[in-house]
Design a protein with these regions (language model features):
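Cytoplasmic helix-loop-helix junction between adjacent transmembrane helices
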Residues: 61-99
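C-terminal membrane-cytosol helix-exit motif in multi-pass small-molecule transporters
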Residues: 132-152, 340-344
Length: 345
């Protein structure tokens, strides 16, 4: 039940500091904000490593929470990319940023596995040291990033309230598509290792392969997603994302074996990609320039709060119910996505 607790704490740190990250960047700029996050994440990883050595569960969770704060800043990369291109190129810019995440499917697990024993007698403490070094690499590239942002002095009355932003059908459509895409994906992905390896006794190697291919499916479509959105429009791509999620749910109704888990998780990753990119790229069309940090921060607060809830509840759900039941619960989210998209159209 608590096997995914650390991941949930990271998500909590991420969602709780979304608005803070956006606010900081509105004051000091993108580059300074990203560098601050990079250094902070490195220190947080070292804290987590030290907590393993001294066997402090509280300190470990604090380190995970601060790592989540770094994630809150890093998710602003997609908005920074959008700001460097025309708005009609936003889907492609976001796709390129997400495509870079394909490396996480292979670099992350392998690096953690290779470095897990470099600190003798403290399994996985070395993995966090490796993470600390890895997070600093981005600082080198950020030194060459030309930030065109200037501190904003917009009067508060020039920006709409959160309620006014939500009242826009397009803004709400984008928000629901992105947040529920993350909710469904996180809810099912987090429960997969428990369902596969613990409950169905499928080998750890096969379980790991399913997760790796799932992550690849999350990011590889980014090669074409931007072009598809430009050709067919945001709403049609969202409907297609819902269809892909539906295949995942349908697969859960059959025997729970390696092949069916593989099919389900691949389509889960594909559906997330289409919904998240279309939702994020639609978001940038629904606010004014002076509202961007406010709208982006609010969007990410909702998206990753929902993700954190999904992550924390996944372990409980899979322990108390079943893989099939968890999939059926997700139908509710898909219906809401369809309704909000239809209403906006």
């Amino acid at each position: 039940m608590f096997s995914n607790f650390a991941n949930g704490i990271i998500n909590c740190g991420c969602c709780n500091l979304r608005n803070f990250a956006a606010k900081i960047m509105s004051i000091i700029g993108r580059r300074a904000g990203f560098i601050l996050a990079s250094v902070g994440s490195s220190l947080a990883a070292l804290m987590a490593s030290y907590s393993i050595i001294i066997e402090s569960f509280v300190l470990f969770n604090l380190g995970c929470f601060l790592l989540g704060a770094g994630v809150a800043f890093s998710h602003q990369y997609r908005f920074a990319a959008v700001e460097t291109v025309n708005k009609d190129m936003a889907p492609k810019a976001i796709s390129i940023i997400l495509l870079a995440g394909i490396g996480s499917a292979f670099i992350g697990p392998n690096l953690a596995n290779i470095s897990k024993e470099i600190i003798s007698d403290h399994l996985y403490a070395g993995s966090y040291v490796a993470l600390a070094i890895l997070t600093l690499f981005s600082t080198i590239f950020l030194l060459f990033y030309e930030d065109n942002h200037r501190p904003s002095n917009f009067v508060k009355k020039n920006t709409r309230s959160y309620f006014e932003l939500i009242a826009q059908p397009r803004f709400l459509q984008a928000l629901i598509a992105s947040s529920f895409a993350y909710a469904v994906m996180t809810f099912l992905m987090t429960a997969t290792p428990i369902s596969m390896h613990v409950m169905e006794k499928i080998s750890l190697a096969k379980t790991g392969l399913v997760i790796q291919l799932h992550i690849a499916a999350m990011f590889l479509p980014s090669l074409i997603t931007g072009n598809l959105i430009k050709k067919f429009g945001h709403s049609k791509i969202m409907y297609f994302g819902v269809l892909l999620f539906s295949i995942t749910i349908l697969t859960s109704l059959f025997e729970q074996n390696f092949i069916n888990y593989l099919i389900a998780l691949i389509f889960l990753g594909l559906g997330w990609n289409f919904l998240f990119i279309s939702g994020t790229s639609l978001l940038v069309l629904s606010y004014k320039e002076e509202e961007k940090f406010k709208a982006q921060g609010f969007n990410d607060l909702i998206v990753y709060t929902v993700q954190a809830i999904a992550s924390l509840s996944a372990g409980i759900f899979i322990s108390l119910t079943s893989w099939k039941t968890m999939n059926l619960v997700c139908i509710i989210f898909l219906i809401i996505i369809v309704i909000s998209t239809f209403r906006a159209d």
